[in-house]
């Protein structure tokens, strides 16, 4: 676990764990991930070595069901279940509508909550398309609990693994929804991938109670 895939608190960023598992399953099964869900169980700290064991439960003509157990020694860090494959169909529809936001060049850079030059947070070019800068939080909730970022990943092409990383920006969305910084940890993340296209990260938060949060990232 290196600084570049860790949080500022020196543990593996949850989205990077799910992304690594997605990449491992796609490599082992030679099929694209269409759905994956991760259960986060423990922390992997910088400097530790995390192994990923891929188990292919069922492999059919068009669909594979597999899972990954990620562990540091005997300590399990996360478990990921996934479906992989594709089935040609004569239909191509999308019912999720992208929000109307300014183009990336017209949006300000997303400011950092804390100065940072080495964690996962430093590896993206993020533009705040809809939301409030950290230093302007005043307790005013975001309309409809919605915020949006333009995100450029200069080091990697867009992929299911990259979407898994971006999908873990729940603390950003929760804080935007309430207009205040609310630290939180991931219990589980789920991604569904229809077709990989250049897209924005649009975060909507429909539920928060007693520190259990539901958030989703449409458009993947």
Q: What do these predicted ranges mean?
A:
Residues 1-220:
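Terminal targeting signals and extreme-terminal segments of soluble enzymes
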């Amino acid at each position: 676990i290196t600084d570049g895939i860790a949080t500022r608190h020196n543990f593996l960023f949850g989205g990077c764990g799910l992304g690594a598992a997605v990449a491992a399953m796609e490599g082992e099964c030679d099929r694209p991930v269409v759905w994956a869900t991760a259960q986060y169980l423990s922390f992997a700290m910088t400097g530790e070595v995390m192994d990923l064991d891929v188990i292919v439960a069922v492999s059919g003509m068009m669909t594979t069901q597999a899972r990954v157990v990620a562990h540091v020694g005997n300590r399990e860090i996360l478990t990921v279940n996934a479906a992989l494959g594709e089935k040609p169909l004569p239909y191509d529809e999308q019912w999720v509508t992208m929000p109307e936001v300014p183009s990336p060049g017209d949006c300000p850079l997303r400011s950092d909550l804390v100065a940072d030059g080495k964690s996962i947070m430093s590896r993206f070019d993020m533009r705040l398309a809809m939301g409030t800068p950290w230093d302007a939080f005043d307790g005013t909730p975001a309309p409809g609990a919605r915020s949006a970022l333009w995100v450029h990943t200069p080091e990697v092409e867009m992929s299911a693994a990259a979407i898994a990383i971006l999908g873990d920006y729940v603390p950003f969305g929760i804080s935007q929804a309430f207009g205040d910084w609310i630290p939180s940890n991931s219990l589980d993340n789920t991604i569904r991938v229809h077709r990989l296209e250049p897209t924005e990260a649009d975060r909507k938060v429909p539920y928060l109670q007693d520190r259990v949060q539901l958030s989703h990232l449409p458009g993947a």
